[in-house]
Regions:
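Catalytic nucleophile loop
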Residues: 104-141
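DNA-binding recognition helix and immediately preceding turn/loop
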Residues: 208-272, 289-303
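Short, Lys/Arg-enriched C-terminal cap helix and immediately downstream tail that follows
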Residues: 269-274, 292-294, 315-324
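Conserved anion/nucleotide-ligand pocket segment
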Residues: 157-201
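Flexible gly/pro-rich beta->alpha loop and the following alpha-helix that scaffold active-site loops
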Residues: 55-115
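N-terminal beta1-alpha1 cap of cysteine-dependent amidohydrolase-like domains
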Residues: 3-78
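…primarily DNA-binding HTH/wHTH and HhH modules…
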Residues: 288, 299, 304-332
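Short hydrophobic clusters on alpha-helical segments that form packing/core surfaces
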Residues: 230-234, 262, 266, 270, ...
Length: 332
């Protein structure tokens, strides 16, 4: 009997809603929390009887808020949890100490709960348990941070979600809704799941194996084959940027044709687009790693003049950003 079969059996035998614990910490990612809870709420809404009952929890209990200024009251973590599912929500600070929940995860797993880790929660678990995390994924920004730090958990897939049987790791953010629709599908008819998706205006439920866009190496689709190929090569060559002349040669179009396509589809030039991709990548590393500013510039293909380019684009020097952040994590 699979974990899902067991969970279904428990719900049917006890005649109660499935219990869901949602663990958050100060600075939690609001879009992920709402993605989890709103799908559960919609599933309950369209079923004759409630299928799910959820509880917000945190390490210390009490009121917990997110970066958007909203928050909720939470109950303290239970030493003997009785939930069927537990979600650990991502956080604006990837280094938040309350994301280190190895013992809590073990307590839930021991009691046969399905554990689902989103974005920063996934990357923290991957980092702290590289030998026991099996196949895994996390948000592409977090993956980049793990790799630049030389973290042993830096290697893994760029899928939206990975289920290793015991723990589900997920990229979080917008993929949270896909994850949740897949989960409620274990307890509802296909028609009910589609109705839930339709209410949310979620046209297509993406498979777990779907690659994340951009950092996940799935091409951003503009509808122009040659333009998409060029963008894909740009994304693959951030540290060692290719000259535009080489890009057009590989794709088989002229430089003028590429410029027209970028202007028509994206209202920019190839060089500007490429530079902004690399600057945004550099900004992620600046906020979330301890690499020196020079090392970040090198990692993003800026051999010289990185600080001035960064300042002209973001309006502030990388030194000021690094000082202001003081080690804080991803901005969500």
């Amino acid at each position: 009997m699979t974990d899902t079969d067991t969970t279904l059996h428990v719900a049917q035998t006890l005649g109660r809603p499935l219990r869901v614990d949602v663990i958050i910490a100060e600075g939690f990612v609001l879009v992920e929390l709402s993605g989890v809870v709103e799908v559960l709420r919609m599933a309950n809404r369209i079923n004759p009887a409630s299928l799910f009952d959820w509880t917000y929890r945190s390490v210390k209990g009490g009121y917990v808020s997110c970066g958007a200024g909203l928050g909720t009251l939470t109950e303290k973590l239970s030493e003997k949890p009785d939930a069927d599912y537990v979600f650990i929500i991502g956080n604006s600070n990837s280094d938040h100490p309350d994301l280190s929940l190895g013992a809590t995860i073990s307590a839930y797993s021991y009691r046969k709960a399905k554990v689902l880790l989103l974005s920063e929660a996934a990357s923290r678990f991957i980092s702290e348990h590289p030998a026991g995390s099996g196949d895994h994924t996390t948000h592409w920004e977090n993956r980049a941070v793990l790799q630049e730090r030389g973290d042993p958990g830096g290697e893994g897939t760029y899928a939206l979600a990975v289920d290793d049987g015991r723990i589900v790791t997920c990229a979080g953010m917008g993929a949270t809704v896909d994850l949740m629709l897949g989960l409620v599908g274990n307890h509802m008819s296909a028609a009910a799941v589609m109705t839930t998706a339709d209410i949310l205006l979620h046209e297509k439920i993406r498979d777990f194996k779907t690659l994340q866009p951009f950092g996940g190496k799935r091409l951003t689709m503009t509808g122009d084959k040659e333009l998409d190929q060029c963008i894909g090569m740009m994304q693959s060559h951030m540290e060692d940027p290719l000259p535009i002349s080489e890009l057009v040669e590989r794709v088989g179009i002229s430089s003028r044709s590429l410029e027209r396509r970028f202007h028509r589809r994206l209202n920019t030039t190839p060089n500007t687009y490429y530079r902004e991709l690399r600057l945004n990548w550099a900004n992620n590393l600046l906020l979330n790693t301890t690499l020196t500013i020079r090392e970040i510039g090198m990692a993003c293909g800026f051999l010289n003049g990185f600080s001035s380019l960064y300042q002209s684009f973001f309006g502030v020097t990388p030194t000021v950003i690094r000082q202001n952040k003081k080690g804080a994590g991803l901005v969500r």
